[in-house]
Structure formats: structure tokens, C-alpha cells
Amino acid sequence: MTSNFSQATLQLCYENVNASCIKTPYSPGLRVLLYMVFGFGAVLAVCGNLLVVISVLHFKQLHSPANFLIASLASADFLVGISVMPFSMVRSIESCWYFGDTFCSLHSCCDAAFCYSSLFHLCFISVDRYIAVTEPLVYPTKFTMSVSGICISISWILPLVYSSAVFYTGISATGIENLVSALNCVGGCQVAINQDWVLISFLLFFIPTLVMIILYSKIFLVAKQQAVKIETSISGSKGESSLESHKARVAKRERKAAKTLGVTVMAFMVSWLPYTIDTLIDAFMGFITPAYVYEICGWIAYYNSAMNPLIYAFFYPWFRKAIKLILSGKILKGHSSTTSLFSE
């Protein structure tokens, strides 16, 4: 049986270069299909997250600490879609890197930085939602614009510092010089990382993920208790006070927001867990994972950057309304920034 993944004749990324990497060609039909699938993910990540950023920045009604966190998260996913996914697509399908060693390091650095930035944003968003649900009336005084700004700064600075250390200082290759030398060929962009730094990378994924799981477990427990309390209060007295009515509306709104962002967090964990586990296994068991499994795990993770706008569009009526206004060009009209996006 003829395989799509190999041919009898050996092919090189650069035919006239002795140190060229070996090319593993796909059949023309499969290549077209993969370009369509991967390209669609990149376009969706770019366009979808750009709509989120424009919505939050343009409409004044969306100018809140929590929404600025969401816009910053969308910016990270947008950068994954525009600066990482297109080049990874070519590398995955052509099995060669045609963009040079310098850009290989930059691409790898951006890849790690933007993806960890997404994780850090989600962790801070879970903290925001926890405060909003457990203390809805004092939440505006606790999670202010300045606090949101600090969270956003940390979510960008730490991943950039970590990624720069891994890909530009050479410390991540200590002890695996022979492997680095073996992987060094023209047309390749495979960055080898030693076990210590792989473990650090795993902890950078595991610790924020654990924090999010704990916080969202508490959020849904508190939300359930609030729902029961509000229902009991309403059924016990026909004349509900304005304060109790306000509490009920606030609690309901924050529970819905927590549910939506809980789905976002779950989607991130499901998308990134296979890749993280695969990387950990490879580092400690001698790179036993087949290349195609690694590629599949990597692209499942990449596709997460395209999922968040779809989640917002499904759960948030205000986002659907904002999309209509943006795509119709109505945001170019005067005073469009003051348009009401909420039904209530």
C-alpha cells in the first residue's frame, strides 16, 4: 500500500545543500486539504479575535476591567493567528522551514510567549470572576482598572521574559548538546529543550490550570448557593425590595459571565493538555512520540486561539450585536461608540 507520508526517493528541503534536512512529502490532495484546514484556523483566529478587540475598545459600554482583560487575551490569540500559525502551517505541511534560522528563533519565542500569555490571562480572568461572583456588590472597588492593568502587564511580561530566556540565551540546551547538533540541519526549525526547562514549562501550565480549576469549582458552588437563596427569598415575599432585586440581577449577570468564561477555560485546557503531556513524555522518554502525533497535538493547541471568539458569539448577545455593527460599517458613524449593546 502506498503511503501519503513517504516516497521511495529521498527528498531534501534544499536539494543542492549537503546539510539539508530530509523532506517528508505529502500527496498533493492531502497537502491542499491540510492547507485549507490549517489556513481556516489561522484566518478564524485573526478575524475573530480582531472583532473582540475592536468591540471592547470601540464601544464605551464594554469599557470595564474584566472586558479589557478579555481584549488583551484576544490580542494574544490574534498574534498567534497572524504571526505563528501561518509559518507553522508551512512547516507542518512541507516538513521544512524555509524562513531562516533567525526567524526560527523569533517564531519559536513568539509561539511560547503568546500561548503562555493566553494562559496567564485566563488565570487572572478566573480570579476576576471569583471576586465578581462571591462579592458582587464590592467587586467594582476590588477589581479596578489599575488592578486589571497590573494583571495584563504580568500576563505579557512574564511569558516574554521566559520565552526569551529559553530561546535566546541557550540555557535550555545545556546537557543536550549532542541532540541539538543532531537536529541542526538546513531547513529545520526544531528547538530542543532539556528536561529541567520542560519541567518548568509544565509547571507554568499546571499551576495556573490548577488555580483555575479550584476557583471555578468554588465559583459554581457559590453560584448554586446564591441561586437557591435568591429563589427562596423571592418565593417567601411577594414584595421584593429594590436592593434584593438589584442583588439578584447582579448575581445572575456575574454567574452567566462566569459560566461563559468557565467554558473558555475548559476549552483551553482540553486544547493544550495533549500537547503539554506529549512534550513532557518526549523529554523524559527519549522523544518516542511519532512526528504526526506531535503535529496533531500542536494544531489542536493552536486551534484554541480560534475558539474563544466562537464561544463569546454563542454565549454573549452583546458580542453578536457588536459584530453586526462592525461588519455593517455602522461603527464608522458618529456616536456609534455609545450604542447600547445590552438588552437589560
Swiss-Prot record:
It is found in: Cell membrane. GO terms for cellular component: plasma membrane. Keywords: Cell membrane, Disulfide bond, G-protein coupled receptor, Glycoprotein, Membrane, Receptor, Transducer, Transmembrane, Transmembrane helix. GO terms for molecular function: trace-amine receptor activity. SMART domains: 7TM_GPCR_Srsx. It is a multi-pass membrane protein. The chain crosses the membrane at residues 34-54, 68-88, 103-127, 147-167, 197-217, 257-277, 296-319. Coiled coil: none annotated. Belongs to the G-protein coupled receptor 1 family. Residues 55-67, 128-146, 218-256, 320-344 are cytoplasmic. This is Trace amine-associated receptor 8b. PROSITE patterns: G_PROTEIN_RECEP_F1_1, G_PROTEIN_RECEP_F1_2. Residues 1-33, 89-102, 168-196, 278-295 are extracellular. InterPro entries: GPCR_Rhodpsn, GPCR_Rhodpsn_7TM, TAAR, TAAR_fam. The keyword RNA-binding does not apply. Olfactory receptor activated by trace amines. Trace amine compounds are enriched in animal body fluids and act on trace amine-associated receptors (TAARs) to elicit both intraspecific and interspecific innate behaviors. Ligand-binding causes a conformation change that triggers signaling via G(s)-class of G alpha proteins (GNAL or GNAS). Glycans are attached at residues 4, 18. Gene3D superfamilies: Rhodopsin 7-helix transmembrane proteins.
